[in-house]
Amino acid sequence: MRNLKTTVTKSIIVFFILFLISNACSRNESESDPDMVAYVGDRKISARDFQLNYEFGFAHLKKTNDRKYFYLKYMINEALLSQEGYRLGLDKSERVKNQEAQLLEELLVEELFRKKVDESIIIADDEIKDAITKSTVKWKLRYWVELNSEDAFNIYNSMQVSGYTKVVQEILASNPEENRDLKDLETGYLTWLDIPPELLEKIKDLEIGEISKPIELQGVYLLVQITDITRSGISDHDYKNAYNRFKQILFYREQKVRAASFVTNFMNPKNVITKGNEFKILANALSEWKQRSSNSDTFLESVEQAGKTEPVLLEMKNNLGNTFITYVDEDWTVKEFLNRFDPHSIKAKPFNKQLFRKQLKHQIAITIRNYFFVKEAISEGLDRSEVVVNQLDVWRNKWVYEEARRFYTTDIKIDNTEAKKYFNDHVSRYVTQIGKQPDFSEVVSQVKRDAYIEQAKRLLETKIEQLKKNSLVKINRAVLDTITVSDSDKSRGTNVFLFKSSSGRLAFPTVDPAWGL
């Protein structure tokens, strides 16, 4: 609660970038199109594709003098190997098919939200102007938090008699282990954008020095005292500069409200019920499985293989056929649910039982919600939408490249003899920062990795040269030279990644970092 500021989601960036990518993929340019930076067989790399890939690519791939050119060559390498992967049928591999199915589900859910929620949102100019005007008012406040209403009102009554400062100082003095002081409970100047709407509604009319009655917020009770209020003017120039930013802010605030309403209205008629006993068994089994030092098997595989030495997992095994989730006219057994559930989506540590179970409940709800959303999206033909098809193509190409790379390098094995020779030939690489030369035995794993990477790189470069003989590769240098990218020393040394907030997946694939190792 120390920092009441909220941040505006970065989804607008993700949405904008995905729109650009899908737009680029769907275009049918001729070879003379000035937007094309390269041609690889029947595949085209647009200036937009290159720019996005470069900006969010790994920093160590941009160290050469002719950075854009060499980065483009990496993209061409991947395109060539990807095309060869398709020829070899690697797009039919289990790994590619599984990833494709998972991505399709994500894209269908996103597309359904876009159609049902985003397309219905209109932000009027008057709303934007009013939001900008409201942002000229700033509050500075201090607060106190209690976990229950009774304690909060007792402290509120004490503050009405003795004042905020004296009461808080006495509480802090009697609890020195908390290691806090008054400054820890103060904010800087906040606008209406920084304060949760339900809190702002309660404090907006408070006078300076006035203490609010306890305000329930996210399961706790807040006492707030306004210490200062400032108001500033705003010019027409300020309005113009702030217009687009505030339009985005209002859009995403409205999106959050409408999305919640859409989910509620969509799911309530399904009458979904989760069985409590089966949930406890699942929570216990998942907790034990996650505490293992290594898990080569999936969670479901571990459960199905459980024996008497694993009583918690065995109990789960014995209940796989039990009904876990019911909804209108249908139900799921525990096993049917696990076939749709990703146990790695639970990030909380098992020892934090309360948080672990809270996240598990949330992910169960998301799994059920997405199941229904995907069915709805397919029934409306969204699996054939341009955005979904284009994104599947982009990622499938990446996965097929990865399969091709694995296909050609899988036989590379580095034994101790080869590793020892590599170490002797590159001994200076392993000297420590304090100038110590380590023994081979101390760095053998790293040496084997380095030797493997070098062999794989040479092998792939040879294969790529062979592929170029059968595929037209053309670079439009004139277009490449016109592409503007971040090119400062700082940007070249910093990795900047863009992830989707909904899934944690990269917003789009970028060049494999292995090319620069």
List each language-model region with its residue ranges:
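Acidic/polar surface patches and capping/hinge elements
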Residues: 116-142, 156-161, 408-438, 452, ...
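Sec-dependent N-terminal signal peptides
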Residues: 11-19
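Bacterial N-terminal signal peptides that target proteins for export
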Residues: 2-12
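N-terminal targeting/tethering segments
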Residues: 26-110, 114-116, 250, 254-257, ...
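C-terminal motif of bacterial Sec signal peptides marking the signal peptidase cleavage site
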Residues: 21-24
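Peptidyl-prolyl cis-trans isomerase
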Residues: 62, 94, 98, 153-201, ...
